[in-house]
């Protein structure tokens, strides 16, 4: 139960940082999550740019995990979203508690502190 609580707390912390950045940057982008009827989820979906009615929404997908090592299985929901018609996933980012950042294909994996630094530098959206 402690691990579940810690995971929820970490997601809440990331949500808070996204909300603060959204406000101080005056971007005011929509923040949401993605869930399929089968229960597959992506923690955060952020509008990457203002939506034009003739084009599909462009988004950034973020998955947050309370883990010291990134498991490639956690990429699957973001990849599934990227394959969905009618939406354009511009960036996929994994946030975790490990020590290093790396890239798997088109998914960037960042330690929490690096993610927050990149967020406030305007590098996430």
Could you tell me what each predicted segment is?
Residues 1-125:
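A cross-kingdom feature that marks ATP-driven nucleic-acid transaction machinery
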